[in-house]
Amino acid sequence: MKYDVLIVGGGPAGSMAAIQLMGSGLRVAILDRAQFPRIKPCGGGISCRAYRRFAKLEHVLKSVPTNLVHKLVFESPSGDAVEFSADGPLYAMIRRLEFDNALLNHCKAGGIEVREDVTVSRLEVGVDGVRLTSSADEEFFADLVIGADGVNSTVAVQTGMRGPWRHNQIAIDGTEESPRTSLNVNPDTMYVYYGYGGGYGYGYLFPKASHVNVGVGYFLEYFKRDVSQKPYVQHLDFLDHLKTTSVLSGQSQRENFHAYVLPVGGPLERISRDRILLAGDAAGFVNGFTAEGIYYAMVSGEHAGHTALNAIRNRNTTAEFLRRHDRACETEIGHELRKSITLQKRLFANPAVIDSVVRFAKRNATARSLLARYGVGEISYEELKWRMVTETLPGYLRYQFDKVWRKATRFSGTALQMPGS
């Protein structure tokens, strides 16, 4: 079968690419190995800017059961914790089973052909197009292919756009998504535990409308080297910690636990070549600080669809023409994602740094606000750094001076006067 555009992967990146091609008159199809709705292991948190960025899909997004979270508790390796809050919601919590299905159904309703239970096992780029072969030996042909097939992207690997992930580029995450009748939590608060179980581990609890996602993850390099327990045993230990601190009650449901990997090493150097575009996890678009990937999948998928439409209409599927996809993604999300990797490395390299950040944020409302706004994508990394210096440094220096002065007073045994008094 011959298509103008084939999209491999029916998740948020693939669906957003297809939405840009709806009504174009082009022959477009989505190929996905699963049958929807399908279980998709994922934390399921989306920064609320997604609803502003994709306002045209409001009716689709609002059809998905969603829990809006207004508080975030961030715990450091030492057990110190700070609470972030905002007037509006910080994150929208969804189930990928429902969210992805809603987007894909929107594509179907818009005339996009969707082929489920099709696993692409081979891909060949030629002068006349791209040949894809399924595991059932079914063949598909297209002028252009969008690889939105996730962290283990067949499209990215078989076109030479990346080799195997290095162990320091991916994380292994074990997550449980169970009904809140089994795992009872406060629905208005999400929890994040940086440095859990070691310098390169993290834990999280995300309450959904009727479910909760709770899990532990590690950089794969650290997990293979330093973690001896199996993922589910680690998971149960984390649940015990949450129960001890009265964050959660109830019992784990083993059948709802899944381990998966996600890219946390930053975007690929190139996300296009002759006749090929990449989007979402396949392109490495995951925030290294928050581990959020859905928003970036949607943005990059939209850009991929727009570029594909222009390429087919201009009869130009060369690497040079398709590079506009790289530029569009770089402008909107690429720089942000690379800076998130910088922050990730600084925090995970030394648990004491995380402890210091949490202690400082506990006593400084401005720092709490800035960190929360950065976490939900309202301000850039550069703005965060600048405003942390200009708006919080004076208070921090005063705090340190007062602490030294109090120590000097106790040591001397006399009531020393402050300078200028």
Segments from the language model and where they lie:
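Beta1/beta-strand and adjacent pyrophosphate-binding region of the FAD-binding site
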Residues: M1-G11
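Predominantly flavin-linked oxidoreductase catalytic cores and closely associated redox partners
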Residues: H106-L248
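Glycine-rich FAD pyrophosphate-binding loop
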Residues: I19-P41
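FAD/FMN-dependent oxidoreductases across multiple families
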Residues: R122, Y222, S228-T307, R313
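N-terminal FAD cofactor-binding segment of flavoenzymes
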Residues: P37-V73
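C-terminal helical "tail/cap" subdomain of flavin- and related membrane-associated enzymes
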Residues: L309-S421
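N-terminal Rossmann-fold NAD(P) dinucleotide-binding loop
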Residues: G14-S15
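Dinucleotide-binding Rossmann-like beta1-alpha1 core, especially the glycine-rich loop
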Residues: R52, G79-D100
